[in-house]
Amino acid sequence: MIRVAAAADIHASDASRERVERAFADLEGAADVVLLAGDLTTSGEPEQAEVIATACRGLDVPIFAVLGNHDHHSDRTDEIEEVLASAGVRLLDRECASCDVDGLEVGVVGTKGFIGGFPGSALPDFGEPLLRHVYAETTAEADAIARGLQAIVHCDVRIVLLHYSPVLDTLEGEPPGIHTYLGSERLATPIAEYGADLVLHGHAHAGSFEGCIGDIPVYNVAVHVTGRNFWILELDGGGVRRGGEVVEVHEPPQ
């Protein structure tokens, strides 16, 4: 059994240092892998990332993360990456990585994702250059997911880690007028094509916990949605089947 601890939208700052450190300390002995689905900081300052880094230094399990929109706000993502790396956190930006957990290879494809919308409210590849640039950015994110999933096809467990949502299901509860800015269905296309066992994202604070891409489970692990610091998902490493039938999740909070 592989225990994955997942969280998004921690929005760390010096004011939340004690809470964040306590949340990570509580993971000791409870998780085999930690996945952070973006918005680690309040406004993208390296000093805020240091709060996360300090908390992570107490853990001896693999930690993978992607950045979110908040983490990009101050245009200091290179510094944030350095801070996180100093604590052993592997930041994934259109990349993939893997780790060994009890003899099973766990592959993680990580990227921020981007906006674009869903059927009925999707941005087109048409019009002003700025609009087409947005479309191209989402294309690049989707292409990175495709490359990553092909690269980890040999892994026993395959996880996609995003910030923006690839499905409409987990946006239920958010105002429909902002769905376009919460994710894009185009992020789901390579996942449906190449397969995964689990997809995680955040960003949608007022969204819903659970969705799917075909038979592949998708979870919005924003702390505002889960109602806790981390959500623990258990994957049966003895026989993980594509489509995630053996992903066990406790009942989400009402």
Residue ranges of predicted features:
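Conserved catalytic scaffold of divalent metal-dependent phosphoesterases
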Residues: 10-12, 78-179, 222-223
